[in-house]
Amino acid sequence: MKRRSDALLGSFQATNVTPPSDNSNSTAGGANGSNSGTPTSTSGKKRNKLIKSCGFCRRRKLRCDQQKPMCSTCISRNLTTCQYAEEFNKNIEKKATYGPYPNADLLKKVEELENKIRILEAEKNTNSSASSMYTSPNFPPLGTSVGRGSTETSSPLPDGVINPYADRYYLQSKHSGRSTLYGPTSMRTQIANSNWGFIEKYKQLWAKVKVERNKWKQNNQKTMCRELGLLDESDWQPDPLIKQICRFLPSYNKALSILDDFFNDGACNEINVILDKAKVRRDFLDYFMPEKEVKAEGDRSIVYILSNPKKNYYKAAVILLILCLKYFHTDVPTPIEKFFTLLKGASTAKVFYIERAQMLILFYYHRETYSFGGDGSDLVNINECLVTTVTTIGLHLNIRETFKEHEVFMGSIESLENVWLMAIFIDYNISCNVGRPLLINKFYLDENQDHCILNSKSKTYEGKLKRYLKLTRPMLLTLYDRDKFPDLKAYSKRIINFVEEELGPLGHYTGENISEEVPLRESRILSMAVGLLLSFYALIHSVLKVRNIESKNNTFQLVLINFSIIVNTTIRCYRIDKALYPEKFEASNPHLPPHMALSMSLTAGLFSKTLVFFCSLIYFKLTLFENGLCLSNDMEVGWSDLTKLTVPLDKDLSLGTAMSLYSSIFDRLFTVGNKELIRTMHRSSQFVIELAIERTYRTILGNVIEFRKLTEETWLAQIKQELDPQSDNPSSEAKIVSDRQRDLSLAVPTPTPSIIPMLPSPGETKNHAKSQSEIIQMLTDEFWANYNSGWEELINQSEFSTLFDDYKDN
């Protein structure tokens, strides 16, 4: 009994594990002082050389390009497998890792067992799932983990599959019959294909939160079905739609002043470049008719909106959208909504004006700023209409040559080039957020052509945006090409290099006091880069099964950087508006100040993508008990540095550190300006929903942390009592557990998982294997029993309305 207790306790004790370094050839017990064992040989150190080529190329002495999961040699020979040797873990002695068995046999056995577990987990999840979701059939959901000593092992690909990402999808099917398809770069697809259990808990909790959300939306008259709701509204107005619109417009001089401000406002400089100021002003004077009688204050009302003989109302639509951005904000009058809906849906060939493209871009920008849906799916139709319009007009041609004689009625060449650039930018955003192939393909945009708009060496914001799109568009095109294998790890390195070379020190964006030297608009490019990088990390994690310490560290690092960018951009925009427009913060103003509204657009889509992946990944780790995983070994917050996109190989970003930073970063929103920032942001329905989702996720994580720690500490107390019944009083041990549990809060981090290899003597191997299996199963059963019971209590007793009014002073 004493020996068994020693073995059990050993499985829960921490070891000093340091991430493997590519720059070191030392074995465990060397310079790092590892406790994993002592050398078994008295001879000199033996160099452990990593074999980088695959087995096929090595046996036939062929040159291997080392691509994973399959090298080009194996692909060209139509081989079904391409195996690489496992990377040697330099911190654990080889004998302790592999034992007396040959490495190749052990790897083969591990692969067989992992495949069996995946099949069983897939069957289990299929039988137990009642939700209406459909995921990629060729790639079963992830149901297990890979041990800490592993590096990267790819699941066997189906015969003939070269690109394992192209057909990775998630079909969301509502009970109403509405369906939405998401592709590989969408976080919905990533989580649905992973089956980590987090989403099921989220659905249960969100069902409760949604009741309060709907009440809040009803009280504040917020809806995402504005366009469809227009069909239900009665219209007893005898006047035509144009005259109805005029009743809501500002005075003639006021409207003209708003147009001038739009082109002079720094918060709108990013979008006004698609317009020719002189042409827009001329269109206003030509088509917006004021009344003849001048009022006492010297101004006149707008009484009618004209069009040209060909009914080009898109000129008026551009001006009305400027008024929506600068005057109406979220409160767009119903007649104007109807006007936009009619113009967007027109199917005749008589609508292909440059003003139609400009209207669609402005409409996209307005919706992204004031009513973004979280994942961009509500903008898909706008993007498709826009791409059709710009390519039908011919903006993909050499603009300076094709339209040099058309500036009088189409606007300046520079504005036309910017319309084309914004169409490329919007197409990229939809592709990344929703997971759809680019609509602007290589036929329309070939970087090898001299007139390609993305060929720029300018150091301006526009130049950097063009170079970023030139870098990443080919990556997305390859991602959806079934005949090519996208090297996502190489793509990730190129994106990281771009950020470091083009956007300046990362600390300027992640520090609490964001540098004023950084142009605000460059936060958009950075948000795009880290968003795509996160999608690649997620695919590498789930498809290629890369689970080493370096991958874990860099994933957590990227997530925390993303959170910092979002929060710091919001705070910076708040401070700019506070200095320039203090009157915008008065309680009587129902709209966001201009720069704070801009912040919603600068980071649109990044928040939901980062949050759902981070919380799902942590939930997965917290609910895993295999391989002696014990979270209670490391309670301290360790190393952290958010000034680089990658973590040094000699550092470890623990789970506890990640949780602590995550909480502290978001909690900053509630302290700036004595809660003035959070009160102001509650004018945005998008922000309110995102904040409620974040609090819901944090509630789930806090709940699972609570019961995970309770389970581990209870078992540790029992093991210690069994080892030495006289040393500890069971009641005092239980009291310690209870006290620690009571002090737990959602902001307190959970420790980094540690996997402790067990090395019993040969005579004990069988009994030890049985005892460790039993203890893991007992821990698992006790955790889930307590967790499910506590979860039901949380669901039934929690007050969720506070998620929507927590900005108020207590």
From Swiss-Prot:
Native organism taxonomy: Eukaryota, Fungi, Dikarya, Ascomycota, Saccharomycotina
Molecular function GO labels: DNA-binding transcription factor activity, RNA polymerase II-specific; RNA polymerase II cis-regulatory region sequence-specific DNA binding; sequence-specific DNA binding; zinc ion binding
Stored InterPro entries: Yeast_MDR_Regulatory, Zn2-C6_fun-type_DNA-bd_sf, Zn2Cys6_DnaBD
Listed Low complexity bias regions: 23-43
Name of the featured protein: Zinc finger transcription factor YRR1
Top-rank taxon, per record: Eukaryota
Region (Disordered): 1-47, 722-742
Segment forming the signal sequence: none
Protein role: Transcription factor involved in the regulation of multidrug resistance genes. Acts in concert with YRR1.
Keyword Metal-binding in annotation: yes
UniProt-annotated location(s): Cytoplasm; Nucleus
Keywords noted in UniProt: Activator, Cytoplasm, DNA-binding, Metal-binding, Nucleus, Transcription, Transcription regulation, Zinc
Keyword Zinc tagged: yes
SUPFAM superfamilies, A to Z: Zn2/Cys6 DNA-binding domain (SSF57701)
Gene Ontology CC annotations of this record: cytoplasm; nucleus
Location of the DNA-binding region in this protein: 54-82
Coiled coil (residue ranges): none
BP-aspect Gene Ontology terms: cellular response to oxidative stress; positive regulation of transcription by RNA polymerase II; regulation of transcription by RNA polymerase II
Residue stretches of biased makeup (Polar residues): 12-22
Organism for this UniProt entry: Saccharomyces cerevisiae (strain ATCC 204508 / S288c)
